[in-house]
From Swiss-Prot:
The gene is rpoB. Coiled coil: none annotated. It comes from Saccharopolyspora erythraea (strain ATCC 11635 / DSM 40517 / JCM 4748 / NBRC 13426 / NCIMB 8594 / NRRL 2338). Its EC number is 2.7.7.6. SUPFAM superfamilies: beta and beta-prime subunits of DNA dependent RNA-polymerase. Keywords: DNA-directed RNA polymerase, Nucleotidyltransferase, Transcription, Transferase. This is DNA-directed RNA polymerase subunit beta. InterPro entries: DNA-dir_RNA_pol_bsu_ext_1_sf, DNA-dir_RNA_pol_bsu_external_1, DNA-dir_RNA_pol_su2, DNA-dir_RNAP_su2_dom, DNA-dir_RNAP_su2_hyb_sf, RNA_pol_bsu_bac, RNA_pol_bsu_CS, RNA_pol_bsu_protrusion. PANTHER family: DNA-DIRECTED RNA POLYMERASE I SUBUNIT 2. The keyword Nucleotidyltransferase applies. One of its GO terms (biological process) is DNA-templated transcription.
Amino acid sequence: MAVSRATKVSAASNMMSGIPGAPKRVSFANIREPLEVPDLLDLQVQSFEWLVGDETWFQRRVDAGDENPVGGLEEVLSEISPIEDFSGSMSLSFSDPRFDEVKASVEECKDKDMTYAAPLFVTAEFTNHTTGEIKSQTVFMGDFPVMTDKGTFIINGTERVVVSQLVRSPGVYFDQSVDKTTDKDVYSVKIIPSRGAWLEFDVDKRDTVGVRIDRKRRQPVTVLLKALGWTAEAIRERFGFSETLMATLEKDHTAGQDEALLDIYRKLRPGEPPTKESAQTLLENLFFKEKRYDLARVGRYKVNKKLGLDLPFESGVLTEEDIVTTIEYLVRLHAGEAEMPDRGQGGDATIPVEVDDIDHFGNRRLRTVGELIQNQVRVGLSRMERVVRERMTTQDVEAITPQTLINIRPVVAAIKEFFGTSQLSQFMDQTNPIAGLTHKRRLSALGPGGLSRERAGMEVRDVHPSHYGRMCPIETPEGPNIGLIGSLATFARVNPFGFIETPYRKVVDGRVTDQIDYLTADEEDRFVKAQANTPIDDEGNFLADRVLGRRKGGEVELLAPTEIDYMDVSPRQMVSAATAMIPFLEHDDANRALMGANMQRQAVPLLRSEAPLVGTGMELRAAVDAGDVVTAEKAGVIEELCADYITVMADDGTRRTYRLQKFSRSNHGTCTNQKPIVNEGDRVEAGQVIADGPCTQNGEMALGKNLRVAIMPWEGHNYEDAIILSQRLVQDDVLTSIHIEEHEVDARDTKLGAEEITRDIPNVSEDVLADLDERGIIRIGAEVQGGDILVGKVTPKGETELTPEERLLRAIFGEKAREVRDTSLKVPHGETGKVIGVRVFNREDDDELPPGVNELVRVYVAQKRKIQDGDKLAGRHGNKGVIGKILPAEDMPFTEDGTPVDIILNTHGVPRRMNIGQILETHLGWIASQGWSIDGDPEWAKRLPEELYDVDPGTNTASPVFDGAREEEITGLLASTKPNRDGERMVKANGKAQLFDGRSGEPYPYPVAVGYMYILKLSHLVDDKIHARSTGPYSMITQQPLGGKAQFGGQRFGEMECWAMQAYGAAYTLQELLTIKSDDVVGRVKVYEAIVKGENIPEPGIPESFKVLLKELQSLCLNVEVLSSDGAAIEMRDGDDEDLERAAANLGINLSRNESPSVDDVVQ
């Protein structure tokens, strides 16, 4: 390819541009990107800026040519204003929303379970129209949650994300379907508003045009036209060209406007007496009044565009012209015409007549954070409007002020309800930084006003050509939500109407320019686009005579360069941020790439992060934009630093101290820790990373570890995706992670008295309390395990009749002898760790606590989890597996120089899954770890820049998606790797090495692929899953053990397991499993007694579930009873209940033990 080497150098360094102080990473990219990746949080941040009418947003809109930009809150206040009383003599209007300073910092809000919010004030103006008096006041409208710099909200101390929603845009949609009986094409159209009644027209199989108003019964369309004041002559004049409409007019027997109105009223309000006035009002209110009907700006834009009208965007109601033009479009569509006159432009202009594709991104828009919150504020204000109206009529006119009319409760409640309970306000995924970043860029078709999982069909879930560059075709969940939840593409942005735009380079007369145009999906359909990897020279001219171009609907064909209108800006334009971090994505099957993109979000932060040897160049941008690293705001010099803070003296003389997060718990129990990566006296530039966060190294995303991998079977121990690991990874803490759990207990006021946090706990030995301080709270640094007391607490017991002795004690010692029970906070069953923090909140110290709570204690327990059998590991290509065996390092296969491999993966995991990217990554990983030097100027190295001819060992590389290292380059580089100290190359040019069995020292018969692969430790840890039970809680009705680890349940012995037992003839074992080990209540106790006393196990009794079955049959009036040989009914009793109770009491067993709310109670 004739690309000059100079161009290539700029392409390699371009990946890192924009962020100063970036670590070295040599790139194999060949394409120069004319545009940097935009800020990945813009989707959230800019939308919220629009809502609050921020200065930066205002300036951005003015620069874009918007003369009078209006913020979201201002827009909704002007919609509701003025609120008039029923007589119209008084009105109240709102304007000028503004915020005060936030009440507390983000850290304080997280600490104290507060909401990060700012007080909202508006100017309210009350006007008395009879006297002309105007009273104006500034009114407090409640605390309004504010977005943090990272694009999240802190609600009651937890970090949440509001997900953007993909919905059908308001507008007019034409549809075509086939009638089942006649096989004729049937056409229909819906006018869908943002709020209000739907209006639907259709042409049925009898070729008559009908209308449905607000989804009620169908009637001829001419009835609606007559109701709007059209005469039969006017209809003939406008629609004379359409036989269908003329036939409909003939069949319509309504005479004049009045009769048509009454006809419509009867259909909409059956059972109510129709009058002309009420019918007229009803129709006007449905479609022509702003209070009841709103197309919204976007709906008006879509209607104008589709029907060729030229009405102002502010007109949110339907007009007569809208309805008439829609009917004309429908009948022309039915008649098979391809175009119709453009009534907006006039003259000879025409618009195409075609049906709409509802899954096209020109017809689906995003409701971003700002709009979702704005809708809730609108709901709250409309509830408040009712209150204001009532107060206007009831209060004394003289005494009325805006403050007395307004009740802000509905507004505050609506906002609170949205953030607390809406399906779109989600608990932020904080497993690692990429999980949080992806969560903020997520697009969901679910939620209020969207689709539901059950109703969504294949079409809406499928990848659509219009997704290109807008929504990632790869990153979506597996399971019921597939295709309904997506991720915004890397370069995409959202326009003011909510449509997603993607950038293209303009092509003029076959020459590619650096002019960037952002196009929406329907604008893009008019042009022909070329791929980003189309070869061009330094001037931007296409090198080939024929260029592959993409037309409407995703069709591709070879075209002359002059036919091309636009060109992609980047090869990674079509994928999301997470997918763009998979090297050699182009060599992976889509299903596996999907798993790879999703599993990166599940990687737990390791003790020591390590950036990938083989990356894509996206690591730095993703880490910086995710916001878990600390960046310098201004250029300057590091004045002072320690583990907890960094002080920068800026060039302008200002001093700024950055506080670092130390070992705090994330939403998902992983450890968040920031550490400085600069030294005192270092010079830093604005935007430079000065401290690493979790899963980052030198400011780059670092989710896993580079491990030396051999791809081979090993004694069957890595069969079916199992993984064999070296003991070295356990000893050296290579894959060790820290997990922090939060345990909390509160002391409340109960009916019997106040609970107390204390060290004085009844019936507990002193050695159990050894680690508690004098308050009864565990000391920091204590090692704890399941069942240990973290916080001592006692609760008053219910009073019983006192014996004379107790009364005497009470008289002598006062309240002290009162009965209390132990309700201490204990470590849950199966958990261990070290106490790293304790927080105490007390009402006496003026801490805000919920009503009835006097004291709240939080204990943080950290666990260091080494890698072990059963943990799940994965690569970035969907190659996941569970550790099957951990071998001593000396037993692992080793190369000729004696170095053992770290991990063995099975060869069978590659061919049928078609994720070959992992093999190329392994080879390039080896090349990067050894370094390389290219001799001469071989053919395969023609596209490599100068800086890639000689690279040191251990240099990080970047192989960007769709523009990475090629197969012939990897083959050439394998032969060019630098030799080790003995002058030997362990891995040959074919990427394989001679390995030796670590146990015998014998060489393996065939060479094995060896290299470095980036391996992630996923959050599916065996410690969280392993579970065992001896006795525990039972279900109330069936008396069978509960299920699941959270309930401390048993293992289900189901239908198929019973069949297996029957097949083996193991009758007694089966009987035991179904009775005394499960729900034979009496038998359980007797068996326990027999085991304790060393006796033989007695006969099983009747299972409780059998009794339940009998009761259910009795409820169906079927009497089931057991008869003796002489036909007498036998009562099913389980022997002597008194003996049973006595035995249970002696053994200390509680027979009435039913479901308990949590495992903690079970363990207690």
